[in-house]
Amino acid sequence: MNNLKRLTKTIFSCFTLSALLLLAGCETLPPMTDLSPITVTDARQATAWELQGKLAIKTPDDKLSANIYWRHSEDRDELTLTTMLGTTVLTLNSTPNSAHLHIDGKDFRDDNAQRLLERVSGWSIPLADLPLWITGQVGPNDQVIARDSQGKPKQLTNTQTPPPWQVAFLSWQSQSGASVPHQLKLERGDLQLKLQLNQWQALGKPAILVGEQP
């Protein structure tokens, strides 16, 4: 059984059991207590954010769909995939120098999150570039193919590692005061990834009022 089929089976098993295990089986990440919701006028102002949405991955042999929760900051990423009933089936926690993946009841570690995810799942997903694309930004290895009437990217090619990633910004929305993508489609060879952002929240350090202790 290939890695994608194994994960699909894991998600299906969690879904069928979640009616019995919903209260005991759901996992939540501990709160990021040093950050709180903020409003920004440009997504580039947010060095940290969290999102909730849908993720779909498709290969010639299989496909899967899951809910995605991603909390991103400059020094930490916490990514969770769940079934539609909220049962956690995959968590990936990483820093610039370490990564921990929990999937199918097993734990895997590496010093690189993208390499770890590819080694275990078989997906070569551009985790380092996704935070830029999620916020509608263009990276140094991106070549913009088309822009919309407001100058936002519609399509780009990432040439860092061949074959290149083709990224399409299908729609945009206003979240936390900024314009961010609503739907993204990524394609590389025979791998296709679709991401829908249902909620994107900018995060920042809470303001300290005069007279308050930090």
Curated annotation (Swiss-Prot):
Residues 1-25 form the signal peptide. A lipid is attached at residue 26 (S-diacylglycerol cysteine). Gene3D superfamilies: Lipoprotein localisation LolA/LolB/LppX. It is a lipid-anchor. Its main location: membrane. One of its GO terms (cellular component) is cell outer membrane. A lipid is attached at residue 26 (N-palmitoyl cysteine). This is Outer-membrane lipoprotein LolB. It comes from Shewanella baltica (strain OS155 / ATCC BAA-1091). The gene is lolB.
